Amino acid sequence: MVKGIWVSTSHIPDLGVAAFVGDGEGLRELHIGSSVTSAVDLIGPENLDVADKVSETARVVSGYSVRDIIGAWRSGEDLSDLALRPIGTPFQQMVWSGLRTIPRGQTLSYQAFASTIGRPSAVRAVASACANNRLGLLIPCHRVVRSDGSLGGFRWGLERKRQLLAWERAS
């Protein structure tokens, strides 16, 4: 077992259960499900297979307890100093970095977003990077929608995507 990788779960009112995966350098994954089992089932095997046991132990990342991260996100607090360690290709990393620049409460189409990162012909690759984002909320792929304004897809379901966008617009 690789030391230092941990999984922690926390109930989030009105949203479900969040499963966080981290290590000594930051968060690797964040998933939301309707139960502990459904949230943990979304964790990538490369992390879950080597993690210490799943627990509700409060973990701290960049000074935030995992229970406080969602509260900070909901209140609109700037979380740019939160150490994130997403695992992906260089292109995915570029997309995920760009997603963090979309202002809270706003959306962009996949086409418009691809243009903002200087890759206007990479719309499908952008959509694929969004689909492979394992740090939803903190890397806000929910802010990217189809050109016609419809929601498109979302790892945690379209109802959650709709709910997240509504919360952001209201705050």
Question: In which residue ranges do the predicted regions lie?
Answer:
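Basic nucleic-acid-binding alpha-helical/helix-turn surface characteristic of O6-alkylguanine DNA
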Residues: 1-120, 171
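Residue-level signal for inorganic ion chemistry
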Residues: 99, 113, 141-142, 164
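LysM (lysin motif) carbohydrate-binding repeats in extracellular/periplasmic proteins that recognize
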Residues: 120-123, 164
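Regulatory, non-catalytic segments
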Residues: 123-133
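Extracellular LysM carbohydrate-binding repeats and other cell-envelope/extracellular binding modules
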Residues: 135-138
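…primarily DNA-binding HTH/wHTH and HhH modules…
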Residues: 147-171
